[in-house]
UniProtKB/Swiss-Prot annotation:
InterPro entries: Aldolase_TIM, GTPase_Obg, rSAM
Residues engaged in binding [4Fe-4S] cluster: C33, C37, C40
Co-factor binding details: Binds 1 [4Fe-4S] cluster. The cluster is coordinated with 3 cysteines and an exchangeable S-adenosyl-L-methionine.
MF (Gene Ontology): 4 iron, 4 sulfur cluster binding; catalytic activity; metal ion binding
Classification lineage: Bacteria, Pseudomonadati, Campylobacterota, Epsilonproteobacteria, Campylobacterales
Transmembrane segments: none
UniProt-recorded name of the protein: UPF0026 protein jhp_0109
Cofactors: [4Fe-4S] cluster
Keywords, alphabetical: 4Fe-4S, Iron, Iron-sulfur, Metal-binding, S-adenosyl-L-methionine
Radical SAM core domain location: 18-247
PANTHER family with a match to the protein in the record: FEMO COFACTOR BIOSYNTHESIS PROTEIN NIFB-RELATED, UPF0026 PROTEIN SLR1464
Family: Belongs to the UPF0026 family.
């Protein structure tokens, strides 16, 4: 899908999960991706192996530097993305190494589908980022092909790449799992994903469903269904979409020992806690913190209550 006159740099925009972000689009004029995801809001496009239109790295660097110099408000993060997959950009390492020196107190983030993490050149570039967010919508091969419609269907190679990168990466590794009703929300697929993410140093799992117009017909999960799916990710910091007022009224009442057991199974986001815990249960959090039975872990702009 061609897009005319779209800027390379956009924002700042406020991200609930990462704070105030200035975005950088490595493919502003055209969708260039090795996936053709069922939920993609950019429209349908044939998946490609390599970028066909490549912006000069010097152009990107000067454009980013100019945008940073003209900011009127502070930002938390510089986000590298694309109308497609940013790790397809052949000069990614040079780009990130060139812009980091003039980022003062600003974290760097890249949004990727994770498909090329096995490539040494891609790994070298990704190591330079403070936060790497990758997608993992399916491990079950049939679900993977239906959801992501990839150029390469070698899911094992993709998983090996993510695993090997996680072993050398020192920053925050965030996984995104987008679920579509009747496609990749089976117990088998969820267990496969959760088991894999527990093997790697995943700082946070962003679990979501369809919330925007997509390329193909893609039914969304309800808030209750998404919450049930999150139970598969026991022991991981899971971020769910912000709850509606109706959902927020369903408060949990529990004693301090029950609350500690709950947090031991699944870390609780600080944003979610006042929405799902009744006032008495919410007060137990302070007691558990004071007794050093739980701690607060920050991932991006989100905080989680975690057991020691």
């Amino acid at each position: 899908m061609a897009k005319e006159n779209l800027p390379i740099v956009f924002g700042p925009v406020l991200s609930r999960r990462f704070g105030k972000s200035l975005g950088v689009d490595l493919s502003p004029s055209k969708k260039q991706c090795n996936y053709n995801c069922i939920y993609c809001e950019l429209g349908k496009a044939k998946p490609i192996e390599r970028m066909e239109e490549v912006i000069k790295v010097e152009t990107l660097i000067s454009t980013i530097q100019n945008a940073l110099n003209n900011l009127t408000t502070p930002i938390d993060v510089l986000t590298i993305t694309a109308n497609g997959e940013p790790t397809l950009y052949p000069h990614l390492l040079e780009l990130i190494q060139s812009i980091k020196p003039f980022l003062k107190g600003v974290k760097t983030l890249i949004l990727s589908n994770g498909s090329l993490f096995y490539e040494p050149k891609v790994q070298q570039a990704l190591k330079e980022f403070d936060i790497v967010k990758f997608s993992l919508d399916a491990i079950d091969l049939k679900a993977f092909e239906r959801v992501d419609k990839p150029y390469s269907k070698d899911i094992n190679k993709i998983l090996e790449g993510i695993l090997s990168f996680s072993q050398i990466y020192q920053g925050q590794l965030v996984a995104e799992v987008l679920l579509i009703k009747g496609v990749n929300d089976s117990a088998n697929n969820l267990k496969l994903i959760a088991d894999f993410l527990k093997k790697i140093n995943t700082a946070r799992v962003d679990l979501s469903t369809i919330d925007r117009p997509s390329s193909f017909k893609a039914p969304k999960l309800s808030e209750d269904e998404l919450l049930k799916c999150s139970l598969f990710f026991e022991g991981l910091c899971v971020s769910l979409p912000k709850r509606s007022t109706a959902q927020a009224k369903k408060l949990v009442s529990c004693g301090i020992d029950e609350l500690l057991a709950l947090i031991s199974r699944r870390p609780l986001s600080a944003e979610e806690a006042p929405l799902i815990l009744d006032p008495n249960a919410f007060k137990h959090l302070e007691t558990l913190l004071n007794h050093k039975q739980i701690t607060i872990k920050k991932v991006g702009s989100l905080e989680f209550y975690c057991a020691f």
